[in-house]
């Protein structure tokens, strides 16, 4: 089981490039950058984990900028959006961002995507149909795949529609970077099986259940859909610093766990990263 590390990159947190270097040096396989464009002051949508919304949600940098810096300062570590809010982004421009980052990183990008939870934030981007947002996500992903894989690309859906176009660069990874779909079981799992190359559930939200218990059913669902479960690896966010729990996830079939660290300077982040690296080493014994 691989270990990744995530942070809301802000102007008061550890630099994204230095963060990625430190993670690469300590054996983490991936760095992840979340996304929120802004937080409306009139927000009514509840924070999924309860309580007050941490200020870093309104203050994080654009994930593609952070990951480009991380790419420039590292050689092997993978670079993921954790997650990109596709409902708030133009698919043509986002397809170019993804392909460009995959090229400058020499094929290290992981395209984590999600539907989001903040209805007011989405509405400011013109996405007012909160309940129907996943249909928009799917069409935008399908449209981006067309742009990445076709010399002359076009897409005609009910929500996304464009005629033949030339769009380069194409991604370094072929046919494209893995699209890793976020969401709880069973709906997120079904979406990952339908159009993803990975699934990202969350481990610290008890209302969504125990991911480890769902994995046999997830694998069965994948096979019934004609897909090899190995082609849809599970990346789990929201994990405890508990060796027994990590063993449980590993033995259940989780491919990667991602550690979320606070938005803080290097003198606070590096020691925490060291502790997680030690847990990773102990797990491998």
Language model: regions and residue ranges:
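Active-site-adjacent structural elements that line small-molecule/cofactor binding pockets in enzymes
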Residues: 1-285
């Amino acid at each position: 089981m691989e270990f990744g590390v995530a942070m809301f990159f802000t102007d008061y947190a550890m630099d994204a490039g230095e963060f990625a270097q430190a993670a690469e040096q300590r054996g983490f396989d991936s760095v992840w950058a979340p996304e929120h464009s802004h937080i409306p002051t009139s927000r009514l949508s509840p924070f999924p984990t309860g309580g007050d919304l941490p200020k870093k949600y309104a203050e994080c940098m654009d994930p593609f900028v952070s990951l480009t810096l991380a790419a420039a300062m590292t050689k092997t570590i993978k670079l993921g959006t954790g997650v990109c809010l596709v409902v708030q982004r133009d698919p043509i421009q986002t397809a170019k961002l993804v392909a460009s980052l995959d090229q400058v990183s020499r094929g290290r990008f992981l395209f984590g995507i999600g539907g989001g939870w903040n209805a007011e934030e989405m509405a400011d981007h013109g996405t007012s149909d909160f309940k129907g947002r996943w249909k928009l996500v799917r069409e935008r992903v399908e449209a981006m795949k067309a742009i990445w894989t076709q010399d002359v690309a076009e897409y005609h859906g009910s929500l996304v529609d464009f005629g033949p176009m030339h769009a380069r660069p194409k991604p370094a990874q072929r046919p494209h970077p893995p699209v890793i779909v976020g969401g709880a079981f069973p709906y997120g799992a079904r979406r990952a099986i339908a159009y993803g190359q990975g699934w990202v559930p969350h481990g610290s939200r008890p209302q969504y259940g125990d991911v480890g218990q769902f994995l046999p059913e997830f694998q069965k669902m994948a096979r019934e859909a004609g897909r090899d479960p190995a082609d849809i690896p599970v990346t789990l966010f929201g994990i405890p610093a508990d060796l027994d729990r990590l063993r449980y996830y590993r033995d259940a079939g989780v491919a990667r766990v991602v550690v979320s660290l606070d938005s803080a300077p290097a003198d606070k982040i590096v020691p925490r990263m060291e502790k997680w690296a030690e847990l990773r080493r102990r797990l491998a014994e």
